[in-house]
Amino acid sequence: MFSRKTSIAILAAMAALTTQVWAADATLLGDKFTSNGADPSASADGMIPAYSGGITNPPEGYVAGGDHIDPFRNDKPLFSITAANMEQYENRLSVGQKALLSRKKGNYRMDVYPSRRSCALPQFVYDATKKNATRARLIDDGNGVADARIGVPFPIPKSPIEIYWNHNFHWHGHRYHAVTSGANVYNNGSLTKIVREDWRYNFYADPQGPISQHANDQFNWMGIWKAPPRFNGSGFSMINTINQLAEPRKGVMFNPSTRRIMQAPAAAVTYEGPLSTADGMRQSHDMFLFSGSPDRYNWRLLGKREIFVPYNAYKASASTTTHEALMTPFHPNPDYLRYELHRVWVLEATQKDGFRMKQARRVFYVDEDSWIFLMSDIFNNRDELIYVQHAFIKNYYEAPACVFEFDVMHDMTNGNYNIDHIKLGFGPADLDYDLDPSDFGSSALRRKIGR
């Protein structure tokens, strides 16, 4: 039997060994791996290029605060994938993409362009990521993260749940503002525009570091809706916590019909709480493809694959693109969408015993360069594909930062879809807006709505 002194010595030795392993991992960043943890090499067939640092400066003619000039506007599609030829490319397609291509309604196709590994981050983010590799750790059975800041916590992941946390913490500035102009698009061709002004203050990404009272707070978020008419003037302010088992999300909301600010019920901000403006097509944990506590799922890594994924979405997100042109029945207009071949981590989340989730199994395709979830295939309890979700990213090269620009949630049961975070007509997000924590909460919400 071990004595207490011996046990302490063993634990200390294990901790020292773990620290040595982490330190060794950190030396691989910028060498065997990119500074953000990706494989820098080209694919065997050369279709995925070697990583050369991404875009770190705006192209000539870019005006700060204005539309992003598409740095790849002269690229032409290499080929198009349709229902007629999808078998030729099936090893590089997701289950969801095959389902979209196979539908009898609509005219879905994927235009595949040259692969451009455009993602880049500021040097201070890479520096923080390297430090995280020596110190970040999972807590509470993987439901939280400690001792990490600014960059992804696990650039060389050792477990599937660490990949989820990398997505959750990918850097896109710490003071965010945008006006979004999404929509619900119906199979009869009609659409309902959803206009929302967003503010977000990210404690985790703050270069000054969070104060102790916000140690478990990832970010503050506030949204005020301007459309559709029945939601005009509605507002919501929320604290998104990191370990949501230890401390659930907290939110307040303003309902213009009652003219009162009230505490948001837990069901409105967690798990499968429906998002009221999405007409049944989106739930709370569908934001950013997955948002919130991972505790109700078992997470499994299915491997790393070369997949055609949405990327470099400059054309679709240009403020000159109209809703009517982009948001066609059954799926967005393929003329505006760009797909490229990239390496992705394939991550599966399956509901744990004891839970009965509508979204019982989810498969995520995770960009190796940015750690952003680019696609999600969502299955019900009968293992039927019910939703397909695609995220479209681009480099905000003025930062630089690879940003989740918008996403599309396809309801595979009826052909409707919801599109969110897109900013048509309003210009790109500001990643360094003048914000501080006092700009959130019930008092701030009251000030914003002017009541």
Which functions belong to the PLM regions below?
Residues 1, 61-62, 279, 399:
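Short alpha-helix boundary/capping motifs
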Residues 1-9:
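Bacterial N-terminal signal peptides that target proteins for export
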Residues 10-17:
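Hydrophobic helical h-region of N-terminal Sec-dependent signal peptides
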Residues 17-23:
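Sec/Tat signal peptide C-region and signal peptidase I cleavage site
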Residues 26-249, 255-257:
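Solvent-exposed N-terminal domain segments of exported/luminal and surface proteins
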Residues 27-53, 81, 94, 222-294, ...:
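Gly/Pro-enriched, hydrophobic low-complexity segments
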Residues 180-229, 287-364, 374:
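Extended beta-strand-rich segments in extracellular/periplasmic secretory proteins, especially
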Residues 432-451:
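Gram-negative outer-membrane assembly/targeting C-terminal domains
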